[in-house]
Amino acid sequence: MASVAEQLASNISFSAFKNATELKKRIWFTLLALLVYRLGTYLPLPGINIDTLRQIFEQNQSGIIGIFNMFAGGAVGRMAILSLGIMPYITSSIIIQLVVPVVPKLNYLKKEGGEQGRRQINQYTRYGTVFLATIQAWGIAVGLEGASGVVIDPGLFFKVSAVITLVGGTIFLMWLGEQITSRGLGNGISLLIFAGIIAELPAALFGTLQLGRQGALSGALIIGLVFLVIIILTFVVFMERAQRRLIVQYPKRQVGNKMFGGDNSHLPLKLNTAGVIPPIFASSLLLMPITIANFSTGEGQGWLNTVTAMLGRGQTLYMLLYAGLIVFFCYFYTAIVFNPSDTADNLKKQGGFIPGIRPGEKTAEYIDFILSRLTVVGATYLVLVCLLPEFLISRYAVPFYFGGTSILIIVNVAMDTMTQFQGYLFAHQYEGLLKKS
């Protein structure tokens, strides 16, 4: 049986789009913002020898630095002013969300502060972003100077200017993402990552086809990879839309001589409640300690290069850490975005109940029981999708990063943006009805 949202979406007339002025403005703003972002990934950092940098990057792009480059939309390979990308913001968000439950002041702001509390927490996230971006930018500047011939005029001036430029680029992307969210279409931060991945796919595909022409990859292997990508995309779409629906009943009420209520509804629980957040968080934590390793060839960097090698694509340590972090963040983020006790209290206030389950605490325990088991399935699904391509890439040496994380981001962002697009279109089509309600 179709959900209410699906029934409403089926009634949307896309012919109404030509009259949806507000929606058109949001789409144009989003496209313009993404264009500005892409232009920024081609503006090189001042004082860099691009040719030497390109040679070093081509020798090391098969490692985890390739993942970093993917999230930055190719800016790392060009050492552009937006090379840090939005990853410091994501890392800061992880840290803030981890400390909110254990810091009484932050926990109070989240639960009781309302809109003002949410803004205050967001401000702390921005401060953390600037702090982390400064550390990472300084590390990159030092690493670039350690690589022979990359920096034209090494020294303190280069380090300071590089830090200011890279941190400014991250702040700009953070602001741009917020503007897309408020004035555009979709979630701004997610769309920036999405745009970076999509922009790099044509070059990656072209490189793979070139290897096929040169005989480095067999035609059968390339065809098999195409079918594998299609199968994974289909599987991801199915799993992202999968949900467990708990039946909710409402008792009948007699008002005068008429009976009201008695309707049945359902409480949808997504199979993957955490969405694409766990793989992104896991990737950002694995990237954070080694953002400069592949650019540094100076003395004293042996241990850092060893860590980088152990965290390379297909390495056992990398895959174990990646899987463990994905599972952890699945449970952690699910606990943040869905509170069984609050849901049970809301059902009780509305007079609803799950058949066979007492309202209140027992309902919360039952919902938590179901949600925990759904999270097991969801976490297993995310681990399989993220690690299977990694294993195949390391096994068959496919020369570009097209892992499960990128597939998950593409599918989730596309679905979320389309859902928001349908919501705006529906609101425009039934504007009069919405005003009355």
Task: Describe each region flagged by the PLM.
Residues 2-437:
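N-terminal cationic and glycine-rich segments that engage phosphates or anionic surfaces
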